[in-house]
Amino acid sequence: MLDDLRMREFSKDEARMLNPLQLAIIGDGIFEVFIRTHILTKNTALSANKIHVKAIGYVKAKSQSCIMHEIEEFLTEEEDAVYKRGRNAKSPTVPKNADVRDYRMATGFEALVGYLYLTGNKQRLEFIFNKSIEIIK
């Protein structure tokens, strides 16, 4: 599934040169698609609205912050650096439904997902996605 969406694979150097908010916007989309697909796969009888509502439980800033708390110890040095760049990035938007700390951690999480996706690191993406499902049951 993941290969189908990428136009090309970025080298690690190319991905590191991207703005962390660019990585985060890609990571946000990829994580959302994964979660919605996971929910639909588990119950094909759900309406689109129910899939959406269930997905929110996984993709909201508070949930992504919880995921980061749990997986941070498993990150490589490189992954931790990407996460921290995303977390510390100055965002032009202010969170409406989350506190700033959760929002920043969620941005770091999304930057990490975007980085792993663009560089084609499917093994680490699968690890993070599977852990996310376990954590936010």
Where does each model-flagged region fall?
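Double-stranded RNA-binding/processing signature
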Residues: 1-137
